[in-house]
Amino acid sequence: MLRAWQAECASQAIEKFTSNKHSHFFCQATPGAGKTVMAAEVASRLFERGMIDLVLCFSPSLTVAEGMQKTFSWKLECSFNGGLGSLGGSYTYQSIRFLDENFWNTVSKYRVLVVFDEIHHCSFDDEGRSNSWGLEIVNKIQDFARYTLALSGTPWRSDRLPIVMAEYSDPDGKVVCDYQYGLQQAVEDKVCRRPKIVLIDNEHLSVKAGSDNQHFASIIDCLKQSDVSYQSVIHNEDAMNFILNSGCQKLAQIRQESPSAGGLVVASSIKHAKDIQKRLVEHFNQSACIVTYHHDNPLHEIESFRQSKVQWIVSVGMISEGTDIPRLQVCCHMSSVKTELYFRQVLGRILRINDSPNQEAWLYTFAEESLIGFAERIEQDIPDSCMYIKQENNVPSAIDEKRLPSSTVSESVQPNRSQPSLLSWGETSDMINSNNAGFTLAFDELRLGQFKQRVIAAFI
């Protein structure tokens, strides 16, 4: 049975498509609301009306593509693997360039609905500021598709380039959506969980660099006024232990009511993820698995966790958007990626409602300046800071998706410090060589005292 918003959105899409005036529909619905089911409903109605012959779905990762294949196959009651007898197929954006001329010649003979999931991954404009995925869509798909349906939970780009096929208002540069379903409405409709974000800070930080000692009352002050980087925070033993302990305690509380509830840790690197998994198992006595883009079969790892009662899954770039694991209810955000888009997509992983008695959703992260801002703006569906900026000069996109795993495209790289050193937080910490964490630092020692937490509860 469709949710109310899914039925309403599907009806509006069909109405627009049948008007014979417009063939593109843009839906913005909060992460976790069920956009794929809505898209499959649109396809089903178009088939019933005899308006299409095939459906092609494109998404940013294999994980999402597999999920779309299952949903469309279920909704259309047929195979959806692109083979003989199927009504379509599900592919990644990266695969578009590898589909040969015979494929495009064949599908161009039919009336096709093309569904673009997480369309914000694809940028294009006439000024040359396009990425490879956006160019592929314009050059190979836009002209032959009878209808196009674009989906996004976060319809903006961190580089503030225009999304392919999207319309923008002037002069504020806000994306124009045919249908919007925000997080507040989703919470009120009990479609999504009400998020609570915990910002972890420290009141007594000290940094030793040579003979100099600096003292700070917050993480923000320390990062702004010293050579300490955010990488130092997320790799520090005391900091990691504190955030993981907080997450483990909350997950234990939730599992008293909902025994299958799980937690997600978003790490900054494979080495970081392995360290976190080891801590969860050995220090906190938790069951934990790990999934990264270096795994031979990450989809199997994710599916195995989805069906199990393992407490934690530690991920590097694999469970950030579009991955449907409703039993996730706690998240420890320890990634070095600090963009609003990534933050919201990660938060969306713990917001999907299921039939468990407890429906709490908790995200733990550190009180870094940008992360604080993201948390405080969580009630805005499209933050003002994420508007498309029109530039006079041609600026090519700095990212080429073909060189990176699709799930890590948004990741930024922190600049290395020039001097190796020893790093320590807290009076009882052992000194650790910062080179072992994959980066270098320009200070000798970092100590901190009492941790504190600030909870932001949205939509109260």
Name the predicted role of every residue range.
Residues N20-V42:
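Walker A/P-loop
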Residues S287-K390:
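Conserved RecA-like P-loop NTPase helicase motor core
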Residues T30-G32, H120-C122, N139-V164, K190:
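Conserved helicase ATPase motor motifs in RecA-like P-loop NTPase domains
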